[in-house]
Amino acid sequence: MAYLKKSLFLVLFLGLVSLSICEEEKREEENEEEQEDDDQSEEKRGFLDVITHVGKAVGKAALNAVTEMVNQAEQ
């Protein structure tokens, strides 16, 4: 009976250890995925910021050009 108890405790202990290791690996994978998602969203945000700044610059240049044309037409 004692031999059976020891075997049972050993099996339970090894099962808990392997479960713990699997959960730790799963957490690490989730953290890596979250980090990759964060990196991708930062890249998208940076790209959108560049597009926004370029759009503003183009809009200002076009507005200045139209204003100059109107001023020249009035003279």
From Swiss-Prot:
<dbReference type="Pfam" id="PF03032">
    <property type="entry name" value="FSAP_sig_propep"/>
</dbReference>
<keyword id="KW-0732">Signal</keyword>
<protein>
    <recommendedName>
        <fullName>Cruzioseptin-6</fullName>
    </recommendedName>
</protein>
<feature type="signal peptide">
    <location>
        <begin position="1"/>
        <end position="22"/>
    </location>
</feature>
<keyword id="KW-0929">Antimicrobial</keyword>
<dbReference type="GO" id="GO:0006952">
    <property type="term" value="P:defense response"/>
</dbReference>
<comment type="function">
    <text>Has antimicrobial activity.</text>
</comment>
<keyword id="KW-0165">Cleavage on pair of basic residues</keyword>
<keyword id="KW-0878">Amphibian defense peptide</keyword>
<dbReference type="InterPro" id="IPR004275">
    <property type="entry name" value="Frog_antimicrobial_propeptide"/>
</dbReference>
<dbReference type="InterPro" id="IPR016322">
    <property type="entry name" value="FSAP"/>
</dbReference>
<feature type="propeptide">
    <location>
        <begin position="23"/>
        <end position="43"/>
    </location>
</feature>
<comment type="similarity">
    <text>Belongs to the frog skin active peptide (FSAP) family. Cruzioseptin subfamily.</text>
</comment>
<feature type="region of interest" description="Disordered">
    <location>
        <begin position="24"/>
        <end position="44"/>
    </location>
</feature>
<dbReference type="GO" id="GO:0005576">
    <property type="term" value="C:extracellular region"/>
</dbReference>
<keyword id="KW-0964">Secreted</keyword>
<feature type="compositionally biased region" description="Acidic residues">
    <location>
        <begin position="30"/>
        <end position="41"/>
    </location>
</feature>
